[in-house]
Amino acid sequence: MRGRPITIAALCADIPSRTLERCNVKVEILGFTTKNWKGGEAREKWSKNGKPKNPGRLNDLRHIIYKAADVHWRQSKKNLGLMLKEGLLKENIDGEAIQWAFNRLVKRKEERKIMMVISDGAPVDDSTLSVNSGDYLEKHLKRTVKFIEANSDIELLAIG
């Protein structure tokens, strides 16, 4: 997600988080991308190992904490600008990012937990999709969502 979509996503994260924080609701703003275009160390390792079939993800993940739940918005507002930094955001491996966010959220002590995902569409990583099925990342995302819905009381919302 880059350009106008990430600008809108940043606003969608910023405005509600400030409002909720004023109501003493803890909010965490997380982001995700890949470290490289078209693979990285994961793809190099796969290639060095003889390119076995069905390798799974072939790009390196970058998970970003723009605002931690226990950090006040004023202390992290500059971090939100990182979303707009040219060159930071690359490809999207949504399922693993949602697993990461889920693992963070289940550790929280709050009684009610809501995860809102703002997306520009389907997960995309050319390196992974070039050697796995074309719907590999989308299937993983759907399995991840089903797992969260079936195995936790976290409310999952999605835009995009």
Spans of model-derived segments:
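Acidic, glycine-rich A-domain
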Residues: 1-160
